[in-house]
UniProtKB/Swiss-Prot annotation:
Disulfide bond residue pairs: 24-79
Compartments where located: Secreted
Protein name in UniProt: Beta-2-microglobulin
Primary location class: secreted
Record has Secreted as a keyword: yes
GO cellular component: extracellular region; MHC class I protein complex
Database matches in Pfam families: C1-set
Record function comment: Component of the class I major histocompatibility complex (MHC). Involved in the presentation of peptide antigens to the immune system.
Organism listed in the record: Meleagris gallopavo (Wild turkey)
Quaternary assembly: Heterodimer of an alpha chain and a beta chain. Beta-2-microglobulin is the beta-chain of major histocompatibility complex class I molecules.
UniProt feature coiled coil, ranges: none
Protein family (similarity comment): Belongs to the beta-2-microglobulin family.
Length: 98
């Protein structure tokens, strides 16, 4: 079994009040069953899209979840990932670098 490696990033350089896309990319995990949730201030974001699950040469899996959003400087954006290799769901914070 392989633990997911997770990255949270925006499609474009972040600026408060400007529309953007928040991505959460999980890769290198096995088995393929995984839960990935984009959240704003601890609440699941609306309109999240899920790419097709794909796999790498070593048969580990990867998946991208993304959502349109307009970053605000006082909101906290995170990605919660749950997988059987994790004792509990892990939360990864987006660092906007405003």
């Amino acid at each position: 079994d392989l633990t997911p490696k997770v990255q949270v990033y925006s499609r474009f350089p972040a600026s408060a009040g400007t529309k953007n896309v928040l991505n959460c990319f999980a890769a290198g995990f096995h088995p393929p069953k995984i839960s990935i949730t984009l959240m704003k201030d601890g609440v699941p974001m609306e309109g999240a899209q899920y790419s097709d699950m794909s796999f790498n040469d070593d048969w580990s899996f990867q998946r991208l979840v993304y959502a349109d959003f307009t970053p605000s400087s006082d909101a906290v954006y995170t990605c919660k990932v749950d997988h059987e290799t994790l004792k509990e769901p892990q939360v990864y914070k987006w660092d906007p670098e405003f």
